[in-house]
Regions:
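Walker A/P-loop phosphate-binding motif and the immediately C-terminal alpha-helix
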Residues: 2-42
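Short, well-ordered alpha-helices that flank and scaffold nucleotide-derived cofactor binding pockets
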Residues: 25, 29, 48, 147, ...
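Phosphate-binding loop that captures ATP/GTP phosphates
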Residues: 33-34, 42-91
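Conserved Rossmann-like nucleotide-cofactor binding loop
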Residues: 42, 97, 161
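Cytosolic-facing regulatory segments adjacent to core modules
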Residues: 72, 81-82, 88-136
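Conserved catalytic-core segment of NTP-binding enzymes
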Residues: 113-215, 220-221
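P-loop NTP-binding site
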Residues: 204, 208, 218, 239-265
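C-terminal boundary of histidine-terminating zinc-finger modules
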Residues: 223-239
Length: 265
Protein backbone atom coordinates (compact mmCIF):
# COMPACT_ATOMS: atom_id res chain seq x y z
CA UNK A 1 0.00 0.00 0.00
CA UNK A 2 1.43 3.35 -1.05
CA UNK A 3 0.19 6.68 0.26
CA UNK A 4 0.68 9.72 -1.94
CA UNK A 5 1.00 13.02 -0.15
CA UNK A 6 1.36 16.52 -1.54
CA UNK A 7 3.17 19.11 0.58
CA UNK A 8 1.73 22.44 -0.38
CA UNK A 9 1.06 26.01 0.73
CA UNK A 10 -0.92 28.96 -0.55
CA UNK A 11 2.07 31.29 -0.23
CA UNK A 12 5.79 30.80 -0.84
CA UNK A 13 8.55 30.36 1.72
CA UNK A 14 6.34 28.57 4.24
CA UNK A 15 8.83 25.70 4.67
CA UNK A 16 7.56 23.09 2.17
CA UNK A 17 10.98 21.85 1.05
CA UNK A 18 12.40 21.97 4.58
CA UNK A 19 9.42 19.97 5.87
CA UNK A 20 9.45 17.50 2.95
CA UNK A 21 13.13 16.68 3.37
CA UNK A 22 13.01 16.39 7.16
CA UNK A 23 9.77 14.41 7.06
CA UNK A 24 11.28 11.95 4.57
CA UNK A 25 14.23 11.09 6.83
CA UNK A 26 11.99 10.86 9.91
CA UNK A 27 9.60 8.51 8.11
CA UNK A 28 12.67 6.46 7.08
CA UNK A 29 13.81 6.43 10.72
CA UNK A 30 10.40 4.91 11.49
CA UNK A 31 11.21 2.16 8.99
CA UNK A 32 9.29 3.55 6.01
CA UNK A 33 10.31 3.61 2.36
CA UNK A 34 9.79 7.12 1.03
CA UNK A 35 10.15 8.87 -2.32
CA UNK A 36 10.23 12.66 -2.54
CA UNK A 37 9.66 14.45 -5.81
CA UNK A 38 10.62 18.03 -6.52
CA UNK A 39 7.53 19.15 -8.41
CA UNK A 40 8.43 22.79 -7.88
CA UNK A 41 9.68 22.61 -11.45
CA UNK A 42 9.90 26.40 -11.83
CA UNK A 43 12.00 26.88 -8.67
CA UNK A 44 13.48 23.55 -7.56
CA UNK A 45 15.39 23.44 -4.28
CA UNK A 46 14.97 20.06 -2.60
CA UNK A 47 18.24 18.74 -4.08
CA UNK A 48 20.10 21.54 -2.28
CA UNK A 49 18.78 20.41 1.11
CA UNK A 50 19.65 16.78 0.30
CA UNK A 51 23.13 17.86 -0.88
CA UNK A 52 22.52 16.19 -4.22
CA UNK A 53 24.91 17.67 -6.78
CA UNK A 54 24.14 18.05 -10.48
CA UNK A 55 26.76 15.33 -11.13
CA UNK A 56 24.70 12.91 -9.04
CA UNK A 57 21.54 13.79 -10.97
CA UNK A 58 22.31 12.41 -14.42
CA UNK A 59 18.69 12.79 -15.47
CA UNK A 60 15.78 14.81 -14.11
CA UNK A 61 12.00 14.76 -14.21
CA UNK A 62 12.26 17.13 -17.19
CA UNK A 63 14.20 14.48 -19.17
CA UNK A 64 11.58 11.87 -18.33
CA UNK A 65 8.69 14.17 -19.32
CA UNK A 66 10.31 14.54 -22.78
CA UNK A 67 11.17 10.82 -23.14
CA UNK A 68 14.93 11.28 -22.98
CA UNK A 69 15.53 8.60 -20.35
CA UNK A 70 13.97 5.68 -18.52
CA UNK A 71 12.12 5.99 -15.21
CA UNK A 72 14.98 4.27 -13.34
CA UNK A 73 17.33 6.99 -14.61
CA UNK A 74 15.54 9.70 -12.60
CA UNK A 75 15.18 7.80 -9.31
CA UNK A 76 18.11 8.44 -7.01
CA UNK A 77 18.46 6.22 -3.96
CA UNK A 78 19.86 8.66 -1.38
CA UNK A 79 19.52 6.34 1.64
CA UNK A 80 23.29 5.78 1.92
CA UNK A 81 24.14 9.30 0.82
CA UNK A 82 22.16 10.54 3.85
CA UNK A 83 23.64 7.72 6.00
CA UNK A 84 20.19 6.51 7.04
CA UNK A 85 20.33 3.33 9.13
CA UNK A 86 16.70 2.32 8.47
CA UNK A 87 14.03 2.65 5.81
CA UNK A 88 14.80 4.19 2.42
CA UNK A 89 14.66 7.61 0.74
CA UNK A 90 14.49 8.02 -3.02
CA UNK A 91 14.71 11.41 -4.64
CA UNK A 92 13.44 12.57 -8.04
CA UNK A 93 14.85 15.98 -8.94
CA UNK A 94 13.95 18.72 -11.39
CA UNK A 95 16.30 20.43 -13.78
CA UNK A 96 18.07 23.64 -12.80
CA UNK A 97 18.83 24.50 -16.44
CA UNK A 98 17.03 27.73 -17.43
CA UNK A 99 16.11 26.41 -20.91
CA UNK A 100 14.55 23.27 -19.37
CA UNK A 101 12.53 25.34 -16.90
CA UNK A 102 11.28 27.60 -19.71
CA UNK A 103 10.36 24.57 -21.84
CA UNK A 104 8.27 22.96 -19.14
CA UNK A 105 6.55 26.29 -18.33
CA UNK A 106 5.69 26.76 -22.03
CA UNK A 107 4.71 23.21 -22.84
CA UNK A 108 3.46 21.83 -19.52
CA UNK A 109 3.03 18.12 -18.98
CA UNK A 110 0.29 15.52 -19.01
CA UNK A 111 -2.35 15.56 -16.29
CA UNK A 112 -1.58 11.88 -15.73
CA UNK A 113 2.06 12.57 -14.87
CA UNK A 114 1.71 12.66 -11.07
CA UNK A 115 -0.27 9.45 -10.93
CA UNK A 116 2.06 7.76 -13.37
CA UNK A 117 5.09 8.65 -11.21
CA UNK A 118 3.34 7.50 -8.03
CA UNK A 119 2.35 4.21 -9.66
CA UNK A 120 5.89 3.51 -10.88
CA UNK A 121 7.33 4.26 -7.43
CA UNK A 122 4.74 2.05 -5.80
CA UNK A 123 5.21 -0.91 -8.15
CA UNK A 124 8.93 -0.75 -8.91
CA UNK A 125 10.34 0.66 -5.65
CA UNK A 126 7.76 -0.62 -3.19
CA UNK A 127 7.58 2.72 -1.39
CA UNK A 128 5.20 3.40 1.51
CA UNK A 129 5.05 7.15 0.88
CA UNK A 130 5.32 9.29 -2.22
CA UNK A 131 5.71 12.96 -1.27
CA UNK A 132 5.35 15.71 -3.87
CA UNK A 133 7.00 19.01 -2.91
CA UNK A 134 5.10 21.63 -4.90
CA UNK A 135 5.13 25.20 -6.13
CA UNK A 136 2.99 27.47 -3.92
CA UNK A 137 -0.41 28.86 -4.86
CA UNK A 138 -3.47 27.58 -6.61
CA UNK A 139 -2.01 26.88 -10.03
CA UNK A 140 -2.82 24.07 -12.43
CA UNK A 141 0.15 21.93 -11.31
CA UNK A 142 -1.04 22.07 -7.75
CA UNK A 143 -4.54 20.99 -8.60
CA UNK A 144 -3.12 18.09 -10.62
CA UNK A 145 -0.90 17.11 -7.70
CA UNK A 146 -3.82 17.35 -5.29
CA UNK A 147 -6.14 15.29 -7.48
CA UNK A 148 -3.46 12.64 -7.81
CA UNK A 149 -2.72 12.39 -4.07
CA UNK A 150 -4.41 10.69 -1.13
CA UNK A 151 -3.69 13.52 1.30
CA UNK A 152 -2.45 17.10 1.26
CA UNK A 153 -0.21 18.52 3.92
CA UNK A 154 -0.78 22.27 3.89
CA UNK A 155 1.86 24.44 5.51
CA UNK A 156 0.96 27.86 6.82
CA UNK A 157 2.44 30.56 8.99
CA UNK A 158 0.44 32.49 11.56
CA UNK A 159 0.07 35.35 9.12
CA UNK A 160 -3.33 36.69 8.11
CA UNK A 161 -2.55 36.24 4.39
CA UNK A 162 -1.57 32.60 4.97
CA UNK A 163 -4.67 31.98 7.09
CA UNK A 164 -7.06 33.31 4.41
CA UNK A 165 -5.23 31.51 1.60
CA UNK A 166 -5.06 28.20 3.48
CA UNK A 167 -8.80 28.34 4.12
CA UNK A 168 -9.46 28.82 0.39
CA UNK A 169 -6.99 26.07 -0.56
CA UNK A 170 -8.64 23.65 1.87
CA UNK A 171 -12.08 24.44 0.46
CA UNK A 172 -10.89 23.76 -3.08
CA UNK A 173 -9.31 20.49 -1.99
CA UNK A 174 -12.60 19.50 -0.38
CA UNK A 175 -14.35 20.10 -3.69
CA UNK A 176 -12.01 17.52 -5.21
CA UNK A 177 -12.84 15.16 -2.36
CA UNK A 178 -9.33 15.38 -0.96
CA UNK A 179 -8.37 15.52 2.70
CA UNK A 180 -6.02 18.28 3.80
CA UNK A 181 -4.08 18.34 7.04
CA UNK A 182 -2.51 21.58 8.16
CA UNK A 183 0.88 22.12 9.79
CA UNK A 184 1.54 25.52 11.34
CA UNK A 185 5.15 26.41 10.66
CA UNK A 186 7.39 29.21 11.91
CA UNK A 187 4.94 29.89 14.71
CA UNK A 188 6.13 32.70 17.03
CA UNK A 189 7.36 30.92 20.22
CA UNK A 190 4.89 32.75 22.51
CA UNK A 191 1.92 31.57 20.38
CA UNK A 192 3.27 28.03 20.00
CA UNK A 193 2.96 27.50 23.76
CA UNK A 194 -0.83 27.93 23.70
CA UNK A 195 -2.46 24.48 23.99
CA UNK A 196 -5.63 25.81 22.30
CA UNK A 197 -3.84 26.99 19.16
CA UNK A 198 -4.49 23.87 17.00
CA UNK A 199 -8.22 23.76 17.77
CA UNK A 200 -8.65 27.52 17.37
CA UNK A 201 -6.88 27.59 14.00
CA UNK A 202 -8.66 24.40 12.83
CA UNK A 203 -12.00 26.17 13.36
CA UNK A 204 -10.93 29.30 11.47
CA UNK A 205 -9.54 27.48 8.44
CA UNK A 206 -12.06 24.60 8.49
CA UNK A 207 -9.28 21.98 8.29
CA UNK A 208 -7.52 19.82 10.83
CA UNK A 209 -4.27 21.19 12.27
CA UNK A 210 -2.06 18.14 12.91
CA UNK A 211 1.09 19.83 14.13
CA UNK A 212 2.88 22.98 15.21
CA UNK A 213 6.47 23.83 14.35
CA UNK A 214 7.75 26.96 16.07
CA UNK A 215 10.11 29.41 14.41
CA UNK A 216 13.67 28.37 15.29
CA UNK A 217 16.64 30.65 14.70
CA UNK A 218 18.82 27.51 14.32
CA UNK A 219 16.88 26.37 11.23
CA UNK A 220 17.30 29.73 9.55
CA UNK A 221 21.01 29.73 10.46
CA UNK A 222 21.33 26.20 9.07
CA UNK A 223 20.54 27.80 5.67
CA UNK A 224 19.33 24.60 3.95
CA UNK A 225 22.84 23.09 4.22
CA UNK A 226 21.65 19.52 4.71
CA UNK A 227 18.60 17.95 6.32
CA UNK A 228 18.30 19.73 9.66
CA UNK A 229 17.12 16.82 11.82
CA UNK A 230 20.03 14.64 10.68
CA UNK A 231 22.43 17.29 11.97
CA UNK A 232 20.37 18.10 15.08
CA UNK A 233 18.39 14.99 16.07
CA UNK A 234 17.90 16.25 19.65
CA UNK A 235 16.59 19.68 18.61
CA UNK A 236 12.92 20.37 19.50
CA UNK A 237 12.18 20.89 15.76
CA UNK A 238 13.19 17.26 15.12
CA UNK A 239 11.03 15.92 17.95
CA UNK A 240 8.03 18.06 16.92
CA UNK A 241 8.30 16.90 13.32
CA UNK A 242 8.72 13.28 14.45
CA UNK A 243 5.33 13.62 16.19
CA UNK A 244 3.85 14.90 12.91
CA UNK A 245 5.41 11.98 11.00
CA UNK A 246 3.83 9.52 13.46
CA UNK A 247 0.49 11.30 13.21
CA UNK A 248 0.66 11.13 9.42
CA UNK A 249 1.32 7.39 9.60
CA UNK A 250 -1.71 6.94 11.90
CA UNK A 251 -3.99 9.05 9.70
CA UNK A 252 -2.93 7.50 6.42
CA UNK A 253 -3.06 3.97 7.77
CA UNK A 254 -6.82 4.32 7.84
CA UNK A 255 -7.36 6.62 4.89
CA UNK A 256 -4.88 5.65 2.20
CA UNK A 257 -6.13 3.95 -0.89
CA UNK A 258 -4.48 1.38 -3.07
CA UNK A 259 -3.18 3.11 -6.15
CA UNK A 260 -5.12 1.87 -9.10
CA UNK A 261 -3.63 3.46 -12.14
CA UNK A 262 -3.34 2.66 -15.72
CA UNK A 263 -2.53 5.96 -17.36
CA UNK A 264 0.48 6.72 -19.48
CA UNK A 265 2.65 9.68 -18.56
N1 LIG B 1 10.35 26.26 11.60
C1 LIG B 1 11.23 27.07 10.99
N2 LIG B 1 11.91 28.02 11.72
C2 LIG B 1 12.78 28.85 11.12
N3 LIG B 1 13.06 28.84 9.79
C3 LIG B 1 12.41 27.93 9.03
C4 LIG B 1 11.47 27.00 9.58
N4 LIG B 1 10.98 26.22 8.57
C5 LIG B 1 11.62 26.65 7.44
N5 LIG B 1 12.47 27.68 7.71
C6 LIG B 1 13.32 28.43 6.75
O1 LIG B 1 12.44 29.16 5.87
C7 LIG B 1 13.03 29.28 4.58
C8 LIG B 1 12.04 28.80 3.53
O2 LIG B 1 11.88 27.41 3.68
P1 LIG B 1 11.62 26.45 2.43
O3 LIG B 1 11.49 25.08 2.97
O4 LIG B 1 12.62 26.67 1.37
O5 LIG B 1 10.19 27.00 1.95
P2 LIG B 1 9.35 26.67 0.62
O6 LIG B 1 9.83 25.36 0.09
O7 LIG B 1 7.94 26.62 1.11
O8 LIG B 1 9.58 27.81 -0.31
C9 LIG B 1 14.34 28.49 4.62
O9 LIG B 1 15.39 29.39 4.83
C10 LIG B 1 14.16 27.56 5.81
O10 LIG B 1 15.39 27.23 6.42
MG1 LIG C 1 10.47 24.81 -1.85
Amino acid sequence: MTTTCVVHSYRGGTGKSTTTSNLSVLLAALGKRVATIDMDITSPGLHVIYNVSSQMMNFTLNDYIYNRCSFQDIVLDITNHLKLPRGAVYFLGSSMKPEEIVKVIREGYSDKFFRHVAEKLSQEYNVDYVIFDTHPGLNEDTLLAVMSSDVSLLLMRMDKQDVTGTYITGQIMKKFGRISYVVLNMVPPNLAESPDLPSEVSKIIDASVIGILPFYEEILSHRSRGVFCLHHPQHPYSSQLLKIAKRLIELTATESQTIDLTGAK
